[in-house]
């Protein structure tokens, strides 16, 4: 059975701690832009935590929402790419082939979620920050666009492990860095083609909504709205 990867985010559980942001940056070799580049809008964060406020002081409530690539089934970033660097895989992922990318930034402009990032410079890590670089993830060069991949390196490793052991993948066996690091278990990842998987069950929840669903992008990230 072909997999179709998706994610569910329980907004009741998210505390806004940004452990997911830190884990994603470490796992995927995301460069640190620094204060000057960040001030110019050149920071890179494959996942961000948005904050919303309700009420008036002192009775103010803060709500958090993690936002990553929504891995849309009708992704507007894909048809605008002239080199097919941004494309759809058989497993429903919006993949980015870095050595095809010529940096037009059409995809970043087409993305309604603002989750694609252009590299304005070559990555530089001052010692000893280069030591924990992940050898399973390529370091992107100046002039290319990058984004969340659902930690495709972990997906591939999990499939290879299951194949070597002559078995099927287990639900919850593959965890992107953001999912693994969340102390509140607010993020769930899995196969949407498996109706019994936890992510499939959550995606069918009456609390489930999609981000900017009215745009017709068919995102595969489901947000479970707050009850409290």
Task: Tell me what each language-model feature is.
Residues 1-228:
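Non-ligating segments of multi-cofactor redox enzymes
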């Amino acid at each position: 059975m072909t997999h179709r990867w998706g994610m569910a985010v329980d907004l009741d559980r998210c505390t806004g701690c940004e452990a997911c942001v830190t884990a994603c940056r470490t796992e995927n070799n995301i460069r640190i832009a620094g204060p000057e580049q960040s001030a110019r809008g050149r920071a890179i964060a494959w996942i961000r935590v948005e904050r919303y406020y309700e009420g008036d002081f002192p009775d103010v409530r803060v709500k958090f929402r993690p936002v990553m690539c929504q891995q849309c089934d009708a992704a507007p970033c894909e048809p605008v790419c002239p080199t097919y660097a941004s494309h759809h895989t058989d497993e429903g992922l919006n993949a980015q082939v870095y050595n095809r990318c010529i940096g037009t930034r059409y995809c970043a402009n087409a993305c309604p979620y603002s989750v694609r990032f252009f590299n304005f410079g070559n990555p530089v890590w001052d010692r000893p920050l280069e030591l924990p670089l992940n050898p399973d993830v390529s370091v992107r060069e100046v002039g290319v666009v990058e984004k969340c991949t659902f930690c495709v390196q972990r997906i591939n490793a999990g499939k290879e492990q299951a194949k070597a052991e002559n078995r099927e993948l287990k639900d919850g066996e593959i965890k992107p860095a953001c999912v693994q690091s969340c102390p509140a278990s607010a993020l769930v990842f899995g196969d949407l083609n498996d109706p019994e998987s936890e992510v499939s069950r959550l995606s069918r929840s009456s609390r489930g909504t999609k981000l900017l669903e009215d745009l017709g992008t068919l995102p595969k990230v489901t947000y479970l709205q707050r009850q409290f």
